[in-house]
């Protein structure tokens, strides 16, 4: 509870300052709504079912994109970590792919894959791929040589070395990449939805914009923040669960 106290206090201070600013600044509600207006719009969207539905669609896109991106990044990262020659061949292309903003190719992906959930999942996976890939390579290569020598002296099989040495030793770095990828996956889903979608939080953002329903825009933005924080928190829980040994004296 002590860890949450500063967060709660800072959040309440922000909301109070926001409310006072909208109350005395004279700015119209359609430009900057008050917290009470946003809360009322949130309750309305929850009651009519639109917010749970569209949030569920976006969350599904995020989770699927995260799974696909992490799986591909982990497999490719492990292969490149074990083969420096292959990394030298592929790394220029991988780096070049990161020089192209995903938002620039998102319209192409929507044209090729359609405006359904598939294009959003692919966009999510592309954004997640690189940070997890890099951390996988770094994590696997950070395994001490002495551990390989020890397992070799015990005549350990390749699978035993993988699961008993490489996975545990590289897990801290890998989870660090997953933390980044989890939050970036939210951006991926929204980029796809803003390009073309008839459902999801990105659709609600555009709908609120077109209808000058600014409180709805704020509701959608805060839901995206909540999703990002939730995913980040899940990864932190995984770190606490699997990396307990790091905190031991």
Show the residue positions of the predicted features.
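N-terminal signal-anchor transmembrane alpha helix
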Residues: 2-26
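Periplasmic/extracellular loop-to-transmembrane helix junction in inner-membrane transport proteins
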Residues: 24-67
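Transmembrane-helix boundary motif in ABC transporter permease subunits
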Residues: 64-94, 111
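C-terminal transmembrane helix and the adjacent membrane-cytosol boundary/short C-terminal tail
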Residues: 84, 172, 176, 218-249
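Generic hydrophobic transmembrane alpha-helix motif, especially the helices
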Residues: 95-131, 138-139
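Glycine-rich helix-loop "coupling/hinge" segments at transmembrane-helix boundaries
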Residues: 111, 140, 187-223, 245-249
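Transmembrane alpha-helices
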Residues: 122, 126, 159-192
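Short helix-to-coil transition segments within interhelical loops
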Residues: 140-146, 150-170, 210
């Amino acid at each position: 509870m002590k860890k949450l106290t500063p967060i709660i206090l800072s959040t309440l201070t922000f909301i109070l300052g926001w409310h006072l600013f909208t109350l005395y600044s004279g700015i119209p509600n359609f430009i900057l709504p008050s917290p009470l207006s946003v809360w009322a719009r949130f309750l309305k969207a929850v009651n009519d079912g639109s917010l749970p539905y569209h949030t569920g669609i976006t969350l599904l896109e995020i989770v699927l994109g995260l799974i696909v991106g992490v799986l591909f990044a982990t497999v490719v990262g492990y292969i490149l970590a074990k083969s420096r020659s292959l990394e030298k061949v592929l790394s220029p292309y991988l780096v070049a792919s990161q020089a192209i903003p995903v938002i620039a190719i998102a319209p192409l992906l929507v044209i090729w894959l359609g405006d359904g959930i598939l294009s959003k999942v692919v966009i999510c996976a592309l954004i997640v791929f690189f940070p997890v890939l890099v951390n996988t390579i770094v994590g696997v290569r950070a395994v001490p040589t002495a551990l390989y020598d020890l397992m070799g002296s015990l005549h350990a099989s390749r699978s035993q070395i993988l699961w008993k040495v490489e996975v545990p030793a590289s897990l801290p770095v890998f989870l660090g990449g997953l933390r980044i990828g989890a939050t970036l996956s939210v951006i991926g889903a929204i980029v796809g939805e803003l390009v073309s979608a008839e459902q999801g939080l990105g659709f609600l953002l555009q709908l609120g914009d077109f209808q000058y329903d600014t409180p709805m825009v704020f509701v959608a933005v805060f839901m995206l923040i909540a999703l990002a924080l939730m995913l980040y928190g899940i990864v932190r829980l995984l770190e606490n669960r699997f990396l307990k040994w790091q905190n031991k004296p």
